From Swiss-Prot:
Pfam families found in the cross-reference section: LtuA
Name assigned to this protein: Late transcription unit A protein
Length: 47
């Protein structure tokens, strides 16, 4: 019984970690796209 509880808790933790990593990747890609679009606009204005 204890083993099952530990296993299920570890399973949930793994999914929590994966969800957090996925969230960070989404934030990074969104920030990168935002910075990239701003840079393109700035570059076209300067040139």
């Amino acid at each position: 019984m204890f083993f099952i509880a530990v296993r299920s808790r570890g399973f949930l933790d793994i999914h929590g970690i994966l969800a957090a990593r996925k969230g960070k990747q989404v934030v990074k890609s969104t920030a990168g796209a935002w910075i990239g679009s701003r840079g393109a606009v700035f570059y076209s204005l300067v040139s």
